[in-house]
Amino acid sequence: DAGFVLARLRDLPTDDEALGPVMDLEQVGIAGHSRGGKTVGRACSTNPDYRACAVLDNIGPARERMTGIDQPFLTLRSAWDDARVAELHDYLGRTGSVAHDVVLENSNHFSCTDIPLFVAEVRLDGVDPASGIESCASILEAFFATFLTNKIAVATNWLPTGEVANVMIRRFQARAGD
C-alpha cells in the first residue's frame, strides 16, 4: 500500500549519494489512475505526509467524498456525464486546501496511460496516443512542481499554457471557515 512504500523510503539511509539529491521526503506527492485514484484519496485522507494528491479519471472513496481532502488536490479526467461531474464537484468543494478539476478534451479513461499505445481498441480516432500521455505528464508535473513547493498562494495559473491543448479547468477554494 502507499503508506508502506512511503515508510520504506523513510528507512533508506539519508546519506545515500544516489538518492539523497533527488528525494525530498518532506515534499511527497501521490497520483493514481482509476482504482489507484481511490487509493490516492484514502492515502491523502489518512496520511498528511502526502503534500499534494492527483487522481486520474476517478473520484475518491465514499468516506472521503463526505469529508474532502486537506491537501492540494487535482482531478485530471476525460469528459463525464453531468451527474458524475456534480458528484466530483461536491467532493472537491469539501477540500481543506485548493482543488482543481481538469478535463482533457478528446480523451477517454485510458488517455493518461500507456495502454492506448498497445491496445488499439481503446485508442481514439485521430488522436495520437502519445499526445495524451504527454499532456497528462505536463499537467501533473506542473501541479506537483507548484503544490509541493509551497506556492499555493500564487498557484492560480499553474497549468502549463501553450504546452497542453484542449483543456478545461475549474478551481475550488478551501472549505468555508478554513
Give residue ranges: language-model regions.
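Alpha/beta-hydrolase active-site loop
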Residues: 1-25
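Gly/Ala-rich beta-loop-alpha elbow adjacent to hydrolase catalytic centers
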Residues: 31-36, 40
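Divalent metal-coordination and catalytic microenvironments
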Residues: 2, 28, 101, 144
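The feature captures the conserved acid-bearing segment of alpha/beta-hydrolase catalytic domains
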Residues: 51-112
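Residue in the alpha/beta-hydrolase core beta-strand immediately N-terminal to the catalytic nucleophile
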Residues: 17, 27-29, 52-54
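Alpha/beta-hydrolase-fold serine-hydrolase catalytic core, especially in secreted/extracellular enzymes
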Residues: 106-108, 115-178
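Sec-exported extracytoplasmic/periplasmic mature domains
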Residues: 7-14, 45, 145-149
